[in-house]
Amino acid sequence: MAFNMDPKKCPMPTQDPNVRNKNFEEVALGYTAEMAVNEAKRCVHCKNKPCQTGCPVGIDIPEFIGHVAEGDFEAAYQVINRSSSLPAVCGRVCPQESQCEGKCTRGIKNEPVGIGRLERFVADWHRENVHTA
């Protein structure tokens, strides 16, 4: 797997201001699969997992991000689901900048990996693609 050494996070698409001022939909639209894979490849998979120590629910962040980088979004969801039953909510409202992303090694000199954005993507992908009885 090739690493993406881009110093900045993949930008999150947002609604056009002229559209969003007429609705109550989310402003941030979320990543596409290609964007999520590209952002996940920014993770350098640190041996001591500082991002995981910053996660209050203990998600195995390097493992779920590794699955996203490989395009295995369902496996990523299963990793998150072991520790959190609300990944779509946490991916949107958890203060990642002071928790997991705040501990990300990439964030020392550049922008940290977009862990919350990836968690949101995985949860949304699961909701849209996995049909349970």
Predicted regions and their residues:
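Ferredoxin-type iron-sulfur electron-transfer modules and their immediate structural context
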Residues: 1-133
